[in-house]
C-alpha cells in the first residue's frame, strides 16, 4: 500500500506528537520513558531530514521500526494508564501506515498479551489487535494464534463493553484468517509441493505440510474450533481458558457460509468437514448428548483437561438444547446447500435427521425448526436436481426427494386432523372467521395461516440472540409446510425445465438421461405434493393462499406436461378440474367422467386421496347456485338437483382454464375432460356463448326449469373466466392435425350429448357448438382436415328440434362458410368453393325458417365481401339457393322473401359480369318470380328495378352476343314489364310503367327500325289509351286499406292520375331521346298528332299535378328542355336566359309538326283559362258573399277563397309553365302564321284570359314577386310573350305589323289593374295581409311595367302607318286620363306620376303627327282636353305633402301646360276652334287661385306655380291678338280670346287682393298672393308694351283703360311688400304710354 506525501507528513507529525506527549507525561516518574521518547523524536527528525522522497521516508521509518517501538513498549510496560493509552495510539498509527515489520509485530503482540494478562486497557487492546492482524501478513503462526486467544479471553471479561468488542474482534479475526487463504490462493495459483519428513507421518498437532502458511493457520484455527465445540483442548489456540459452544458453532457457521471455496478447493479442509465437523454435528444431534459447559483452558494451564471433562452444568438441558440445536440446523442447512458434492452421504444423513425432527416434535420447536431448514433446501432448484440425481435415480438408494415430499405431505395431513374438538375451539373458529384472517378449515379444525413466510425469512433459525425458542405462532407449522410445498413445486419445475433444455454441446445420450432424471423428479414428488396441495386447497379460506396453492397445482401440471407423465398429469388435471366444480364427486356424479386410477392400484381414487369428501368445506362464499349441466349419461333425476359454486371454485376455474390453454399441446387424451369441465363451468355460471363464439354472462335464463342464480360478487370473476375461455379456441387451433382432430371429436361428442338432452325438451349447453365453431374459424387454413366432419355435424344439428341449437348450428356453418371461401388452403379454388357451397346448398332441404335465413345471410355475405372470388361454376348454385326461397314451402314467409330478394338484387347489381350470359334468362325468371309474389309489395317494386339493371347489362353485351340474342332478351324483358304495367297494385303498376319506359328510353336505339313501329303502336300508344281510360273511370272513393295513405293518393282515381303523370313524362323522354329513330317512321305525323292530342287532354284535365306534368312534358317534347318552373310558383325564367334553363338542343321537328304544336298550345292555353274562369263563376254562384271570390281582371289581383268540392283551378305554376313554352315555339312558327293569329281576338285574348284566372287561396301566400323586377313569374312570362310578339311585328318585311296596336291594347288592359278602386272590405288572396299591401307588392309593379312597355312600344312605332292610323294614341290618352283623374287616390302614387310622364311622352310623339293629319285625328284633341281637365282639376285631393313633393307634382303639371302651349296653342289655327276654346278655358281656370285666402289650413293645396304657368301661357297666347296672314288670323283669334281671359284674370286678382288685404288687418297675406298680384301687374305692363307696338288693338286699349281703377285700388296695399310697391309704381308709369296713345283709336278709324 503506497502512502502519499500528505499522509507521510501527517504520520511524521503524529508520531512526533505522540512521542512528545509521552516525554511530557513521563518526565516526573518515568524518566527512562522520557529519554526513550526524546531519542525517538530525534530519530524521527533525522529520518525525515535525511529522506528525500515520501517512499524513502516510509522505507526508512519501516527500517527503524524497532527504535520507534522502543519508547512505546516502555510506556506499555509501565502499566500507567495515560502512558499506555498514548503508546497504544502510536502503535495503532504504525499499524495503520504499515510501518511495523514482522519482528515489530511480534514485539507488539507480546506486549499486548502482557496488557491483557494485567487487565490493562482491554478495550484499546481490542482496538489494536484486528488492524494488526488484517493489515499485512506480518502476524502469522503462533503470533496470530496469540492474537486470537487474546480476543477469546477478552470475550469473557467482566466489562460488557469489552465482551461485545471482543466478540466482534473474534469474528473479524476468524474471517480475516480465511480471507488470507483466498488471497493466498489468488497469489499462488500453483500447488505448493511439500516433501514429508522422512521416517514418519505428519504430526497431528500441526497443519498438513501441503498447505501454505495462511492456509495452515486457517486449518489449525478451524480444527481448534471443532475441538472447542466438542469440549476438547485446542492445539493451536493455546491459552483459551473458557468459551461457549454457541460461539464456536456461530464461528463455524460463518466460516462454512463465507468461505465454501476454501473447503472445496483444499481437500485438507474437506477432510476436516468429513472427519471433524460432520461427526461433531451428528454427535450433538444425538439425544444422548448432554449439555455441557465448556470452560477449557490452555493445555499448559493448571486446570489442564480435567476441567474440560468435568465442568459443572450451569444451565438446564432444555434451555441449552435450543440454541445448540438451532445453530446445528443452520450448519446442516449450509452443508447441504454448499457442500453436498463433497459430503454426499453426510447430507443424506442430515436430511434424514431433519425429516425425523419433522416427523415427531417432542419439544415443540424441533418440527418448525426442521421445517425451516427443509424449506431452504427444497426451494433450491440445484438441490432438488442433486437429490434426484444422487439418490432417487439410483435403484438401491434412498429416494430422498420422495421422502422429503412425503414428509411435508404427512405434516400437512397431520396438522389438518383434529383429535379433540371443544366448544372453545368452535368459538375460536367463529371469531377467526369474523376477523377475516387467512387460515385453513378442515372438519371443524381451524388453523390460522401465518403470512409473509419465505425460505429466507424464518423465526427459529434467525433466533441467534435467544437462549430459549421464541413463541411459535399458531398455525406456523402448517403455514411453513404450505409455503415449502409451493416453493418445492417451483424448484421441481425449474429443475425439470433445466434438465429438459436441449444443449447442442452435450454428449450423445445425455439428453435422454436428463429427461429420465426429470421424469423421476416429477414422479417421486408429484403424488405427495398433489395430495398435500389438494388438502390445503380444500381447507384454505383465504383467496391469496388459495391462489398460491392453485399456482402450485398449475406448476405441477406444467411440469407433468414437460416430462410427458400422462398418468400423473391426468391426476393433476383432474384435481384442478374438481376444484373448479362444486364437489369432488361432481364430474363422476353429474358428468359421468370417472376419476383417473391411482398410481398404486391399492390406493383410493384420486378424488378421495386428495379430498376428504365429508370434510369438503362449505364456508366459502357461494357465488352461484343452480342445476348442473344436463348430461344424457346420468340419471335425469340429477338434472334438477341444486349445486353450489363457491368463490374458491371460480379461483380454481381461472387457473384450470389458464393451465389447459397454456399446455394444450401436451393434454393428449384429456380433451374430453377439459372441455366437459369448461362446459359445466359455463353452464353453472350462466355464461352463454355469443354468435361469434365469445362467452359472456347471461342476464337471465328463462328456459331452464330451475334458473341459475349468480351473485354480484361473481360478476368480475365471470368476466375474467369469459376472457380465459375465449383463449381456449385459439390454443386448440394451433395444434397439429392429429391432436386437432382429437379435440374436434371431443367437442362433437359433447355436442351429441347436448343434442340428446335437447331432444327431451330440456335446455342444453351450447358450449360445444360455440367452441367447435370458434376452433374451426381459427383453423380455416387447413380446411380439408376438418370441413366434412364439422360441416356434417352442423347440418345435422340444423335439422334438430331445438330452436337454439338449430340456430346456433346454422350460424356456425354459415359463418365458417363465409370465412372459408377466401381462406388460403392447399386445395384448389374450384374444389374448395364446391365443398363449401355444396354444404350451404344442403341447407335447402331443411324447412326451418331461421336456418334458411342464415343460409341466405351467408350467401349475401359471400357475394358482398367475396363475390369477386366466386368462380363461374359457383353461380348456378348461388342462384339456385336464392330461387329456392320462392319455390319452397316457405315462399310465403315475409322475412325469407325479403332476404332472398336482397341476394337477388346483389347478384343483379354487382355480379352480372361474373355470370355466364346463358344464365341471364334464369336470373330474369327469378326476378320475375319475386316481382309477382304478393307477400311484400316493396320487393315486387324493387324487383322491377332489377330488370332495369339487367337491361343495361344486356345492352353492354350486345356486341359480344349479337343483335338477335339481345333483342330476344329485350322482348322477354319488355314482356315481363308489360305484364306488371297492368298490375292491380298502384305502386307496382307505377314502377313497371317507369321501368318499361325508361328501359325503352335508354336502350331503344339498340332496336332496329322494324322493331320501333311495334314498340310505338303495340306498346306505347295502347298503354296511353289504357291509362287514360283507367284514369277517367277510376273510383273517387277513399281507400279503406290498413295502410294510412297521403291525401293525394288515397283514392283509386288519384293513383291512376299518378300513373298517368309518370306515363306522360316517360313517353316524352322517349320521343326526345329516340327522335331520330321516330322521324324515320313513315307515319311519324300520325304518331306526333296522337301524342300531342294526349298531352292536350292531360294538360286540361281537372287535376293540378297531371295538368302541370302534361305542360312540362309538352315543353320537353317540343324544346328538349324543361323550364325550372315546377309546382314552385316562385320560379322565374326568361326565354332568352341561358342560366335559367337546362342546356339542351331543340329536337329536330318538321315545320308541319311545329304548326300543329302551335295550335295545341293555343288550345291548352284556352283550356286552362276556361277552367279558371269556370271555377271563378262556380265560386261566385256558390257564395256570392265571399269577397275573396269576386272576379277580377287578373290572377295577380284575384283569388278563390273557397271552392266547391271537385272544382279545379289552374295555378300560377301551370300558367307560367305554358307561357315558358311560348317564346321558343313562337320563334319557330312566326313565319308560318297570319296576322289574324295575333289580333286581339286571338293571341292577346288568350293572354288576357290567362291573366283573368284567379289564384287559389292556398297558393296565394306563396306567390312572391321577383327581387329585381318585382313581378311574379306569371306576370314576367306574360310580358315576355308580349315583347316577343312585338319584336317579331317590328321586323322589316314582316306582315304582322298590323298586330302592334293589339299588343299595346293588351298592355293597357294589364295597366288598368292599378286603377281599380279598393273597397274597405276587400281582402288579399290568402287573407294574410291587407289588400292595399298586396296590391302594392303584386299588382302595381305589373301594371306600371305594362304601361311603360306600352308607351315604349307606341313611341318606337308611332310613325308606322299601321300604328298611327289605328288611332291607338287616342286610346292611350283616354286610358291615361283615369290614373291622372284618380291621382292621389291611386293605390300607389307612382301610378299617376307614371301616367303623367307617359302622357307627356305620348303628346310629344303624337301631336306633331296629328297636326299633319287633322282629319284622321279629329278625336285626339278632345281626348287631350278631357284628360288634361281630369288631371288638372281632379277632385281627388292629396293629403298634406312635403314642400318638395308638392313642388315636384306641380312641376309635372307645369310641364304639361308647357306642352299644350308649345305643341297645341302655338298651332291653334290647325286645331278645332271649340278645342282651342277649351284649352284657353283650362289655362284661365288654372291661373285662378282656387283656395280661400282666409283659410290657412288648406294653404298646402295651393298651386302657385301652376297658376303662374297658366297665366304665362295665357299671356304668351295673347301675342296672337293682331295678325295679317291666314295662319296668323287663327292666331289672332287665339290672341283675342287669350287677352280677354288674361285681363279678366288680372282684374280678379287685384280685386281679390285688395279685399283680402282689408280683411286681413294686421296679418300679412301669404307670399304667394303677393307674388300673384305682382305677376298680374307685370302682365298689365306687358299688355301696355304690346299695345305700344301695335296701336291698332283698340279693344285691348279699352280693356287696359278699364283696368286702371283696379290698379289704383292696389295703391293702399302696396306698402305690404317693397317688391309689390316697386312693381305698382312701374305699372302706373306704364300707363303714361297708354295715355299718350289716346288718339290712336281715331287714327285707326281714319
Curated annotation (Swiss-Prot):
Keyword Protein transport: yes
Primary localization: Golgi
Keyword entries, A-Z: Golgi apparatus, Protein transport, Transport
InterPro entries, A to Z: ARM-type_fold (IPR016024), DCB_dom (IPR032629), Mon2/Sec7/BIG1-like_HUS (IPR032691), Mon2_C (IPR032817)
GO terms under cellular component: Golgi apparatus
Compartment(s): Golgi apparatus
GO process annotations (BP): protein transport
Job of this protein: May be required for traffic between late Golgi and early endosomes.
Family: Belongs to the MON2 family.
Listed name of the protein: Monensin-resistant homolog 2
Record gene name: mon-2
